[in-house]
């Protein structure tokens, strides 16, 4: 259950009239079926015993980073089949539990007129606020976004302007190239069952002389509204030449 205060409203009436109606109007129920994100790493005991003292800690830190990256990819673009429904997916039209991509808004410029149309669509859904952000792949940021934001002053200084509509920019490799995901990240609901855990087994692979590390995370995610996020295609935006 999560609240949507921007669409809720209070009800005037006699002092002792039904107050439950007023409270429940601001809540929305979501049926979540948790999925598991998991993986394992087998490491030779000799590497741990003969390697640097920090190696065991590094392995655990690396597993955490891999799991976090996998979760980030699912939050942005998960298809909903035993994983979260990502920001870039429609919330209807699933086939065999796989949700389709949202239609992309094609942009040829990153100017006020182009971006304001998307902000107006968010406002139409009562989801436009000061926390709206633009999520973009780092490659696309440098090639398309940065290249169109930086200007040179008559004095020769370079000034990095904000986007015309003022959004903060979030860099994420989970976002496909030539794509912008626009919305308030807080309008994505991520339900988790406890923290991610990493268990170490020293005898499971005894004959192979290996330690086994197994990582598990239980959770699910979905946008709070079908129009919480809009996806823009910036393939047609002129930008920097990226060397191959």
Model-derived regions, located:
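Extended, low-charge hydrophobic alpha-helical regions
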Residues: 31-49, 140
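Structural signal for terminal/edge beta-strands and the immediately following C-terminal loop/tail
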Residues: 222, 227-244
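Extended oligomerization regions of viral-like shell subunits
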Residues: 81-217, 241-244
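Short helix/loop capping segments that flank catalytic or ligand/cofactor-binding pockets
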Residues: 9-13, 51-52, 143-146, 222-224
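Assembly/oligomerization interface modules of large self-assembling protein complexes
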Residues: 1-39
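Acidic, glycine-rich loop-and-beta core segments that form the ion-binding/anion-interacting portion
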Residues: 41, 45, 49-105
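Structured loops at beta-to-helix junctions and adjacent beta-edge loops in soluble globular domains
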Residues: 2-5, 44, 137-139, 172, ...
């Amino acid at each position: 259950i999560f609240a949507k205060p921007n669409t809720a409203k209070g009800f005037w009436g006699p002092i002792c009239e039904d107050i439950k109606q007023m409270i429940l109007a601001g809540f929305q129920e979501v049926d979540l079926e948790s999925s598991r994100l998991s993986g394992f790493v087998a490491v030779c005991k000799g590497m741990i015993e003969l390697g640097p003292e920090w190696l065991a800690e590094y392995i655990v830190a690396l597993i955490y980073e891999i799991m976090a990256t996998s979760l980030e990819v699912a939050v942005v673009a998960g298809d909903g089949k035993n994983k979260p429904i990502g920001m870039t997916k429609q919330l209807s039209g699933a086939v065999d539990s796989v949700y389709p991509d949202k239609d992309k808004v094609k942009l040829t410029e990153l100017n006020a007129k182009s971006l304001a149309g998307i902000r107006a669509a968010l406002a139409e859904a009562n989801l436009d606020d000061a926390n709206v952000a633009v999520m973009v792949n780092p490659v696309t940021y440098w090639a398309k976004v940065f290249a169109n934001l930086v200007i040179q002053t008559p004095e020769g200084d370079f000034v990095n302007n904000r986007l015309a509509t003022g959004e903060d920019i979030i860099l994420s490799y989970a976002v496909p190239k030539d794509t912008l995901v626009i919305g308030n990240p807080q309008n994505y609901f991520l339900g988790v069952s406890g923290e991610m855990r990493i268990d170490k087994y020293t005898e499971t692979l005894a004959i192979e002389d290996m330690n086994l590390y197994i990582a598990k995370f239980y959770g699910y995610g979905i946008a709070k509204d079908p129009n919480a996020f809009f996806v823009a295609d910036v393939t047609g935006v002129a930008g920097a030449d990226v060397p191959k």
